[in-house]
Amino acid sequence: MILTVTLNTALDLTYGVPALVPHTSHRVGDISERPGGKGLNVARVLSALGHETVVTGFAGGATGAVLRDLLAGLPPRDALVAVTGNTRRTIAVVDASTGDTTQLNEPGPLVTAGEWAAFLTTYRELLGEADAVALCGSLPPGIHVGAYAELVRLARAADVPVLLDTSGEPLRRGIAARPDLIKPNADELAQLTGSREPLRATRDAR
């Protein structure tokens, strides 16, 4: 089983408009919604390729309920942990005249210490079933910046290969815990190392 972790899950909303014009009202045409966040997107692809996949992270409030209803019809197994706050929404507005997309991302729910502890219990249990784990995306409010480093160490202690896909200080601290793989893009790697030369930045990140 492949485990994907999305601490800051999202309900992805996409609105299609004929043309996005500032300072005007728009009539939305096409509307779609789906479970989102990096780890959920990874799980969706892995499931489509035939891999047994489990998703964990946080979901809460009315938005989280919609997200979990949508997950119920998909192959990844839902092992999300409930929180009191509302799961965030990401809103993509697609301009049909240009094909351009404008993205709006909410910050996510405030996760309490008790909710984090409940997640760690679930995570440890799932590691016992996992052949690999992918830790993906941003951290919601309330989660300490070294959270991914903690999760990497737990995976390594369980002898489970771990991939880390995040950015900024959570990535820097996560790398120090020695994940098996990291997946920064060019901007994230430059932010981490101060270099925009890919080979040098990769060496510096190590």
Question: Where do the PLM segments sit?
Answer:
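Aromatic/hydrophobic pocket-lining residues that form π-stacking "cages" and hydrophobic walls in ligand
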Residues: 42-43, 67, 123, 151, ...
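General beta-strand structural signal in soluble alpha/beta enzymes
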Residues: 5, 79-80, 134-135, 162-166, ...
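Short, charged, surface-exposed secondary-structure boundary motifs
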Residues: 14-15, 114, 191-196
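Glycine-rich phosphate-binding loops at beta-strand->alpha-helix junctions
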Residues: 138-143
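Conserved phosphate/ATP/ADP-binding segment of small-molecule kinases
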Residues: 146-206
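Conserved N-terminal subdomain of the carbohydrate kinase-like
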Residues: 47-131
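Glycine-rich phosphate/adenosyl-contacting loop at the front of the ribokinase-like
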Residues: 1-56, 65-66
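Glycine-rich beta-alpha junction loops
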Residues: 7-11, 59-60, 85-87, 188
